[in-house]
Swiss-Prot record:
Residues recorded as bearing Phosphothreonine in the entry: T65
Species of provenance: Arabidopsis thaliana
Keywords noted in UniProt: Chloroplast, Lyase, Phosphoprotein, Plastid, S-nitrosylation, Transit peptide, Zinc
Tissue-by-tissue expression: Strongly expressed in aerial tissues including leaves, stems, flowers and siliques.
GO biological process, one term: carbon utilization
Protein name: Beta carbonic anhydrase 5, chloroplastic
Gene, per the UniProt record: BCA5
Superkingdom, natural source: Eukaryota
Protein's job: Reversible hydration of carbon dioxide.
Amino acid sequence: MAATPTHFSVSHDPFSSTSLLNLQTQAIFGPNHSLKTTQLRIPASFRRKATNLQVMASGKTPGLTQEANGVAIDRQNNTDVFDDMKQRFLAFKKLKYMDDFEHYKNLADAQAPKFLVIACADSRVCPSAVLGFQPGDAFTVRNIANLVPPYESGPTETKAALEFSVNTLNVENILVIGHSRCGGIQALMKMEDEGDSRSFIHNWVVVGKKAKESTKAVASNLHFDHQCQHCEKASINHSLERLLGYPWIEEKVRQGSLSLHGGYYNFVDCTFEKWTVDYAASRGKKKEGSGIAVKDRSVWS
């Protein structure tokens, strides 16, 4: 059963198609949206407190019975979570898998995604939910702050995914997606240059140090939240620039068989910005050491 497409209004960049992405800070708060009613779940910790009060009021002696009640409540809460998950899976099987059985049967034999998506691990920004990717559409990598490490650095799961998707799956597009209020970017902006080297988070987000430096150079007078928003977008472009440092990626981009794109999802006002790397114009900027050029910028709102 084909889903009815959602229509968006698209406004195109009024500037030259090869101009650099305008990274100026935009308003954080957008229009109000209607609220969706959700089912209230009472946390297990609150239920335990209520149970304790009931025991005290009834005059019963706290002990093994009280402890057993707490364990039972925890188990019930855990069961509720997986019951919900089970129902979502069964709904998927009935409404999608069985309704498009031939497609899923073909996917069981092979995959041929058109996109490699590099997105943040943040639970609020699932690219499949936000952009409607279906199984088989996009090979997806998610890490803190949607960063691309330098080609020269050691092996990482992100670099392995790049190699596999580009050289084996032959994806036609790489889309790096950043987002508003990114905790990884906030950690990067707060981080001291000589931070705790034992921290996994520090050792990862330092990959985006160049974006932090460029943000501090042009936006140091702004409020910290606005600096972070600036860095969120700057980091996307620095990751796109890094991708061109992978020889086999740059070769395919040069041949025209692979395109690099940036995206920024603002979940505060539900807008999405998209742009594409202009490789020809970026080559000149690479020689100048001034970053990349972009084209085809649009805002979906």
